[in-house]
């Protein structure tokens, strides 16, 4: 029963399985002399899913999802140190995307898995942004980075929080389905803390007000976003984006949070059995590892927002040795990048070990962390890179400790001298 003649000359098509006409269903798909409707396709999928063994379904759901170990191994290629944070992130991201697969395949399941958004706490230049970027690149999902300090409540001068979702859509060429599985990294989240831990009667459009607006996005809402190119006329529909499955990673330096944590731990550590350790003996990293939700609330984040970010990972302040490793070891290491740039001119680059340590020391002194490494090396090589394209017979550029500490020009080795050596 594929087609029947109606009262008119046109033929009415029917589903070969359930017998419904093309007017009773949304879609009728044609095969060789047979037709199947969208309702029968859904029914067939349901039967196959029900008959699939639980273990096989789980394996299928995980087939192309990297394991926590694989995620961490990939992070190791780009991020030096921060082992506890990388392990915690790997598990959280794996569970998040495993939850999405489960949600798609097990509709009607009585167990509802909640989303675990992530909060990264650590000093400037410790790798918070790089961790989020590397995760998104590895998982091949849309990624956008937003600065919390530019956000204001809707209706005020500044950037609306829903602009974040619009940027996410732009990053994947307005593919709504892909955007709804993306990653959003919100930097400087600590800068929108409310001015006191007591609710204020005055408007705080860039503090608590923004937190309330972000809360809706993070916990899951339907965000209205203008279509690509903006609305051409007032009646054109907005795109509706469900943020329920978007993974939000928030990061901040949280300067001053260590005092809040110390006040709490000192208050609870009174008595004969209490362990005594002076403030001078504890690094900020050690203190941050003891952070509790109540500390973040005391710092100025609203309780609802803290509750939506159950995974809290603290990043360590980078040591001199770690900064030297960052200069040379990752796939996108600064030294490797400058070596490649000079090789394009037919010149080798050598940076002496003492010079690497000098760069690390200067970055520590500036309190810029890994972020400051590139600018220090660039500053020492800028004149050389300006002159190299016009220079002849230069074989190698050597950066010594004095190049960094005393601003002396790098040593240039010429081809004739190189041959004699």
Swiss-Prot record:
Record keyword Chaperone present: yes
Sequence positions that bind ATP: 123-130
Binding positions (Zn(2+)): 15, 18, 37, 40
GO molecular function: ATP binding; ATP hydrolysis activity; ATP-dependent protein folding chaperone; protein dimerization activity; unfolded protein binding; zinc ion binding
Entry GO terms, CC: HslUV protease complex
Gene Ontology BP terms: cell division; proteolysis involved in protein catabolic process
Source organism superkingdom: Bacteria
Keyword ATP-binding: yes
Functional summary from the UniProt entry: ATP-dependent specificity component of the Clp protease. It directs the protease to specific substrates. Can perform chaperone functions in the absence of ClpP.
Name of the protein: ATP-dependent Clp protease ATP-binding subunit ClpX
Source species: Variovorax paradoxus (strain S110)
Lineage, broadest ranks: Bacteria, Pseudomonadati, Pseudomonadota, Betaproteobacteria, Burkholderiales
Gene: clpX
């Amino acid at each position: 029963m594929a087609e029947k003649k109606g009262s008119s000359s046109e033929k009415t098509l029917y589903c070969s399985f359930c017998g419904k006409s093309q007017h009773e269903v949304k879609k009728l798909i044609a095969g060789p002399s047979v037709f199947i409707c969208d309702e029968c396709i859904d029914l067939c999928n349901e039967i196959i899913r029900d008959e699939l063994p639980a273990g096989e379904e789980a394996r299928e759901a995980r087939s192309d999802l990297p394991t926590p170990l694989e995620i961490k191994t990939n992070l190791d290629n780009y991020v030096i140190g921060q082992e506890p944070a990388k392990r915690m992130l790997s598990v959280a991201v794996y569970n998040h995307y495993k939850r999405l697969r489960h949600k798609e395949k097990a509709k009607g399941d009585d167990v509802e898995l909640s989303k675990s958004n992530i909060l990264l706490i650590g000093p400037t230049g410790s790798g918070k942004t790089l961790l989020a970027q590397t995760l998104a690149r590895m998982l091949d999902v849309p990624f956008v980075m937003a600065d919390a300090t530019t956000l204001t409540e809707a209706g005020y001068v500044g950037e609306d929080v829903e602009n974040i979702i619009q940027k996410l859509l732009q990053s994947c060429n307005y593919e709504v389905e892909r955007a709804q599985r993306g990653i959003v990294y919100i930097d400087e989240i600590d800068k929108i803390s409310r001015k006191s831990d007591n609710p204020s009667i005055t408007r705080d459009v860039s503090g608590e007000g923004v937190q309330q607006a972000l809360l809706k996005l993070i916990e899951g809402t339907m965000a209205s976003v203008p279509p690509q190119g903006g609305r051409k006329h007032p009646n054109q529909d907005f795109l509706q984006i469900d943020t329920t499955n978007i993974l939000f990673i928030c990061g901040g330096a949280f300067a001053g949070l260590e005092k809040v944590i110390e006040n709490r731990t000192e208050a609870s550590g009174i008595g004969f059995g209490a362990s005594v350790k002076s403030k001078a003996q504890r690094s900020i990293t050690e203190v941050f590892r003891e952070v509790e939700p109540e500390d973040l609330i005391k710092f100025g984040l609203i309780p609802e927002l803290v509750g939506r970010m159950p995974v809290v990972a603290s990043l360590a302040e980078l040591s001199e040795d770690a900064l030297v490793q960052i200069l040379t070891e990752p796939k996108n290491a600064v030294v490797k990048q400058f070596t490649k740039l000079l090789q394009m001119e037919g010149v080798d680059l050598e940076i002496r070990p003492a010079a690497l340590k000098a760069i690390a020391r200067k970055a520590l002194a500036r309190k810029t962390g890994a972020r400051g490494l590139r600018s220090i090396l660039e500053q020492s090589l800028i004149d050389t890179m300006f002159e190299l394209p016009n220079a002849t017979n230069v074989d190698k550029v050597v950066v010594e400790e004095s190049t960094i500490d005393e601003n002396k020009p790098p040593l240039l080795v010429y081809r004739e001298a190189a041959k004699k050596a």
